[in-house]
Amino acid sequence: MANLRIEVISLFPEMFSAISEYGITSRAVKQGLLQLTCWNPRDYTTDRHHTVDDRPFGGGPGMVMKIKPLEDALAQAKAAAGEKAKVIYLSPQGRQLKQAGVRELANEEALILIAGRYEGIDERFIEAHVDEEWSIGDYVLSGGELPAMVLIDAVTRLLPGALGHADSAEEDSFTDGLLDCPHYTRPEVYADQRVPDVLLSGNHAHIRRWRLQQSLGRTYERRADLLESRSLSGEEKKLLEEYILARDDS
C-alpha cells in the first residue's frame, strides 16, 4: 500500500508524466511510496465535442470550467482514493504553500488535486466539493497543473524512504525555518576559489556549526522575514552575531 495516494483532475493529464517518469517522484512511484492517478473531465462529457467549459454569466473574457464533468471526474477519484481524501483546488486565492503546509499535506493518506484552466472553475463546484484552496505564489499561470506538480514534488520529498539519504529532507531549505547552507564538491580548487577549509577538516562538530552559521547568515541577508517568526537558540544567536561581525569587518 502506498504511503500517499494522489488523484489529479486535469484537462492535461499527460503533463504529469514529469512526475511519474523523472527524478525523486518517479522513484517514489516505482517504490510504491506514492500512487498517482489522473482523471480527465473530458472523459465524463456526453456531447460529441467533449465540452468542458462555457461562457461566464455576466460577460467578460475567457471561459469557465463546467460543474458536471468536474463532479463526475471527482466521483471517480473519490471512489479510487476513498471518501476521506482531502480535495484541494490549486488557486491564486488559496493559502500560500510553505514548508509547514507541505508537512501537513504529507501526513494525509490521500489527496485529490483539482487543476483548473481558462478563467477558473464554477464557484458552485468549489463551494460544494473543495476542502482547501492552495496557491504557490502571487502570480498568474495558465492552469493548475504546474502548481499541482510543485505540491506533489514537495510532499513526496517528505515521504519516508523517498530520498536517497535519510537526512536529506531534514537538511533542505525551510525545513528548520532557515535557508540552506552552501554546498561544494570536487575539485577542491576551481578558478582559484577554494572549498572552505572547515569542510575538509573532518571535524563533524565544526562542520555542523559552520553549516548552521551559514544557514543563519543567508537567511538574515536574503529572507530576514523568516527569522522574525523563528525563535533562535542561544547557540544560533551567537553564530549569527559572529557571522554579521565577520561580514561587516570584511
From Swiss-Prot:
The Enzyme Commission number assigned here is: 2.1.1.228
Q: What class of enzyme is it?
A: transferase
Any idea where this protein resides? Cytoplasm
Keywords for the protein's UniProt record, in alphabetical order: Cytoplasm, Methyltransferase, S-adenosyl-L-methionine, Transferase, tRNA processing
Domain of life of the native organism: Bacteria
Xref: CDD domains? TrmD-like
- Record carries keyword Transcription regulation: no
Query: Tell me, what's a Pfam family for it?
Result: tRNA_m1G_MT
Q: Which InterPro entries match?
A: Alpha/beta_knot_MTases (IPR029028), tRNA_m1G_MeTrfase_C_sf (IPR023148), tRNA_m1G_MeTrfase_TrmD (IPR002649), tRNA_m1G_MTases_N (IPR029026), tRNA_MeTrfase_TRMD/TRM10 (IPR016009)
Q: What is its main location?
A: cytoplasm
What cellular component GO annotations does this protein have?
A: cytosol
What catalytic activity is recorded? guanosine(37) in tRNA + S-adenosyl-L-methionine = N(1)-methylguanosine(37) in tRNA + S-adenosyl-L-homocysteine + H(+)
Gene Ontology biological process terms, A to Z: tRNA N1-guanine methylation
The entry lists its GO molecular-function terms as: tRNA (guanine(37)-N1)-methyltransferase activity
**Binding, S-adenosyl-L-methionine:** G116, I136, G137, D138, Y139, V140, L141
User: What does the protein in this record do?
Assistant: Specifically methylates guanosine-37 in various tRNAs.
Q: How does it assemble?
A: Homodimer.
Q: Which PANTHER family match?
A: TRNA (GUANINE-N(1)-)-METHYLTRANSFERASE
- Can you tell me which family this protein belongs to? Belongs to the RNA methyltransferase TrmD family.
What is this protein called in UniProt?
tRNA (guanine-N(1)-)-methyltransferase
Q: Which organism is it from?
A: Pseudomonas fluorescens (strain SBW25)
Gene giving rise to this polypeptide: trmD
